[in-house]
Amino acid sequence: VRNFVTCRINRGFCVPIRCPGHRRQIGTCLGPQIKCCR
């Protein structure tokens, strides 16, 4: 997962920090500093 669209398709969401709670990172959204979490 490397962008906002594929993040959303994979039921993820983009955060500028590390993933909250028990969510795990499945990729990035806009470069490595924006994480795609699910």
From Swiss-Prot:
Neutrophilic granules. Has bactericidal activity. Active against E.coli ML35 and S.aureus 502A. Its main location: secreted. One of its GO terms (molecular function) is CCR6 chemokine receptor binding. Belongs to the beta-defensin family. Disulfide bonds join C7-C36, C14-C29, C19-C37. One of its GO terms (cellular component) is extracellular space. SUPFAM superfamilies: Defensin-like (SSF57392). Keywords: Antibiotic, Antimicrobial, Defensin, Disulfide bond, Secreted. It comes from Bos taurus. SMART domains: DEFSN. It is found in: Secreted. The lineage of its organism: Eukaryota, Metazoa, Chordata, Craniata, Vertebrata. The gene is DEFB8. GO terms for biological process: cell chemotaxis; defense response to bacterium. Gene3D superfamilies: Antimicrobial Peptide, Beta-defensin 2, Chain A. It holds the Pfam family Defensin_beta. This is Beta-defensin 8.
